């Protein structure tokens, strides 16, 4: 079945196909039908009860338009966003490119979204009964020195409506954003956001976990430094990781020269290395959500065995369809 749908989608450019899929899932979410069952493979992470350990990675549903549709594919959790304080168009099109031979995708979207207020309204309307994470970022026009302002605005607005909040400082498509992963800049950001989280938990009488999303391009030394900051500021979880700037796995393939972050199957080895190194540094202090390159039960299990407690998928679903989600959710064994 999906082979026919894929043929139709792949006759379009990547972004048009994505937008078409979002609208189709938005419609499916409104219909009184179950597309696919929710596989039960429960796990508790960050004090939250997940029906299964397979989540939708941020970037798929930036505005939270199709939460119920994605929920009907069997995801145990859904992360929407990345969202910014105000709407922005992102980078010029075309900005999404398939690398067919490698089952990869390059994007340089640049946090295109309708703004945090629109996303919050969509989340409030959703009937999906799994865990919902909201991924927050900064507007492109905001100087990097003022990035904290944008993260605080978003955190305050989404806190009441999210089960957990992810702070995205690792997209390669927003100028200078990745500099927030290092040293004093990271410490200042985490210190301030942790303080804000504590204030909001008192205001709403409910503690919502705060998660950091990092890049797979960090060196071992940089990973150790990030891990130290995560522990010191009592951050609740970490997503490892985002897209990569490396082109080593796709050298010579069509579209490999395009600028942006590479995701999909070619990212698998790099993301597993990130998880493994991070797990050694954290030594169980906080959970890791594995993301990047998961394309089979074996590749997903490899990330669990490397130290991840949950997994997120997006690019591989474009190539393989929702059956992948069902297989992962049923067969992944969390340690």
Swiss-Prot record:
Binding residue positions for FMN: 58-62, 82, 135, 168, 213, 241, 264, 293, 314-315
Enzyme nomenclature, EC number: 1.3.5.2
Topological relation to the membrane, as annotated: Peripheral membrane protein
Biological process, per Gene Ontology: 'de novo' pyrimidine nucleobase biosynthetic process; 'de novo' UMP biosynthetic process
Annotated InterPro entries: Aldolase_TIM, DHO_dehydrogenase, Dihydroorotate_DH_1_2, Dihydroorotate_DH_2, Dihydroorotate_DH_cat, Dihydroorotate_DH_CS
GO cellular component terms listed in the entry, alphabetical order: cytoplasm; plasma membrane
Catalytic residue positions: 171 (nucleophile)
Localization, UniProt: Cell membrane
Binding note for cofactor: Binds 1 FMN per subunit.
Keyword entries, A-Z: Cell membrane, Flavoprotein, FMN, Membrane, Oxidoreductase, Pyrimidine biosynthesis
Keyword Membrane annotated: yes
CC cofactor: FMN
UniProt record similarity statement: Belongs to the dihydroorotate dehydrogenase family. Type 2 subfamily.
Protein name in the entry: Dihydroorotate dehydrogenase (quinone)
Gene (UniProt): pyrD
């Amino acid at each position: 079945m999906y082979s026919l749908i894929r043929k139709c989608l792949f006759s379009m450019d990547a972004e048009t196909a994505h937008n078409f899929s979002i609208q189709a899932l938005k419609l499916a979410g409104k219909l009184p039908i179950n597309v696919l069952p929710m596989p039960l493979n429960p796990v508790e992470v960050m004090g939250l009860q997940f029906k299964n350990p397979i989540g939708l990675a941020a970037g798929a549903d930036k505005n939270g338009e199709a939460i119920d549709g994605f929920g009907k594919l069997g995801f145990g959790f859904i992360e929407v966003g990345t969202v910014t304080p105000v709407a922005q168009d992102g980078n010029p099109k075309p900005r999404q490119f398939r690398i067919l031979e490698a089952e990869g995708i390059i994007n340089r979207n640049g946090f295109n979204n309708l703004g945090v207020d629109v996303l919050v309204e969509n989340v409030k309307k959703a009937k999906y009964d799994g865990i919902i994470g909201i991924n927050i970022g900064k507007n492109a026009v905001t100087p990097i020195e003022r990035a904290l302002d944008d993260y605080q605005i978003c955190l305050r607005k989404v806190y009441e409506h999210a089960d957990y909040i992810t702070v995205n400082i690792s997209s390669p498509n927003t100028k200078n954003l990745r500099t927030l992963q290092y040293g004093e800049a990271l410490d200042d950001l985490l210190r301030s956001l942790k303080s804000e989280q504590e204030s909001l938990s008192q205001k709403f009488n409910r503690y919502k976990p705060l998660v950091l999303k990092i890049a797979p391009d960090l060196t071992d030394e940089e990973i150790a430094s990030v891990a130290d900051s995560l522990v010191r500021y009592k951050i609740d979880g970490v997503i490892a990781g985002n897209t990569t700037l490396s082109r080593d796995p796709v050298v010579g393939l069509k579209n490999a020269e395009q600028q942006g972050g590479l995701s999909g199957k070619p990212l698998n080895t790099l993301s597993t290395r990130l998880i493994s190194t991070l797990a050694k540094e954290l030594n169980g202090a906080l959970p890791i959500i594995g993301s990047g390159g998961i394309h089979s039960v074996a590749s997903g299990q490899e990330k669990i065995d490397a130290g991840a407690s949950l997994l997120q998928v997006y690019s591989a679903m474009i190539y393989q369809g929702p059956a992948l989600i069902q297989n992962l959710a049923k067969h992944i064994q969390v340690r």
